[in-house]
Amino acid sequence: MFLPDHRISILPSALLLLLNAALTAAQTRKTLPVNFVVSETPPIAPFYTLPTADQLAVSIALCTGSVDGPIPRFFLTNSSTTASPGPDGGDDVFEITLDRGHGSYTGPFQSGGVLAVTDVPPQMTFEIGVSDGSTIHESTSSSAIFGDTTASQALLFSPAFSRLDNPQPQYPNYTLPRAIPSIPAAPSDPKNYTLIVSPTSNGLTSMQQTACALSTQKSTGIVANESFWLRDASGWRTEWLMTGLTPKTNYTAYVILDAYKVTLPIFFTTKSSTFSCSLVSKLPYCPSISYAVPLPPPPAPAATYDNTNLPKAISDPLISALTNFTTTLTTFACGRDLYSPLVTCADCQQAYRTWLCAVSFSRCADPDTAPPLAALLPSQSPNARNAAFPSGNAFTQLLPCLETCTATDRACPSFLGFRCPVPRFNANVSYGVGYVDSGQEGEKGGGSMGMWDDAFGNVWCNSGL
C-alpha cells in the first residue's frame, strides 16, 4: 500500500525518446586521442569525442572510393552546448570539406569537442588524425622530381628535405668551392619517404588522393637502389632507381611522407625498346645531372653510371675545366669589390658549373616518346661538345636550353669573356631556343612552354637540372 504523497510520475513519451537517443549516442561515441590516427571501418561510429586543448588539428583521409564517388560528411563542434553536431547546425558547428579525400580543421577546443559523421557510403573506410601540432593528413603542394628514363629504368627524386645553409663567402676569406666540392654527411634523421609508381592506365589519379588509399596499390617495378643525394641547393633528396619497367609506357608516381602525407602526382614515359643510352647520376662535380647520356651499358653489376664507374676520359677534362675557371674567377676582386648587387662570384661559379655539365653530358632523347616541338638533334658520338664520349653510337640529342648559357653570362664578371649565341644568329643550331623565354619572332616554340619541363614528363630542352 502506497501513501498518498508517494506517487509514480509517468514521463512524456517524447522526453523518453530524447533520453534514449542521448544514452545511445553516448554509448556509441569514441574518444579520439591526441597525436594519434584512428582507422575506421564499418560499422562506423556516428560520434567522436575530442579532448580539451588550447588548439587541435583534426584531419580526415578517405581510404576507399573514387574522387567522383559518394563521400561521407563530417561535422565538428568545439562548443560544450552542442552534443550532436550535424547538417542542421548548432552553436559553433563546422563542416570539414573534403577535397580529393582530404579535409581538416584547426582551432581551439577549450571545452573539448564532438566530431560527427553522416552519409557514410557502404564499405567506406577512413582515418581520423588529431594533433596538437601540425595537421597529420595532408596533400602537399610538392611532388617528386623526374630525372629520366631508359626503356626499363627510371630515376626519380623525393621533395627536398634538410636544406643546407650555404652562406656566401665574405672578404677577406673569399674561397669558392673546389671543382669536386666536399659532400657533407647525409642527415641522420631523414624523412620517411615511400615511392609509388604505377602505369597511368591503372587510374591512380581517380582514387582518393590520400596516403591510405594510394598505399593499397602495389608499386610497379623494382627499387634497385634507394639512397640520399644532395642534388641542388634545395637540400637532400631521396633518389630512387627503378628497374623492371615496360618500354613506351606511361607511368604515374607519388611520394608518401611519414605514412600520412602525399605529394601531387607526376607522370613520365619510358623510352622505346631500341633506346641505347644509359643513365648517369651522383656526380659530385655535376650533382644535378641525372639523365640518359650516349654511353653503352655500364660494367656489371652496376645498372647506371656514377662517380665510381664513369670513364675518367670524360670526368677528368670536365674537372680540369672547372678548376681552371675557378682559378681565373678568383683573380677578380670578389671579396673586396661588389660587382653586382644581385649576384656574387659564388653564383657565377655555380651557373658555370650547371652550364658546363649540361653541355658536357649530352642528354639523349627518344624520338618515339619525346614531346612535340622538343629541341631534338640527330647526333653521333663523339660530338662537337665532348669528344671524350666513345664513338660509333648514334643518338638523338635533346639540346641544352639557351637560358642555361645566358644565366652564366648574367652571373659572371665581363672580364671572363663568357658569351652566348643569340637567337637571330643561329643559336638554335646548338641550343634549344624559345622554350623557356620568348625567342625572336617566328622562333620554334616562341617561349610558349615557359619552362623546360612539366609534371607530365615532357622535357623540351636540357636545363642541366
Task: Give the residues covered by each predicted segment.
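Solvent-exposed loop and beta-edge segments used for protein-protein assembly and interaction
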Residues: 52, 109, 245-247, 349-351
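Beta-strand-rich binding-surface signature
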Residues: 55-57, 73, 239, 250, ...
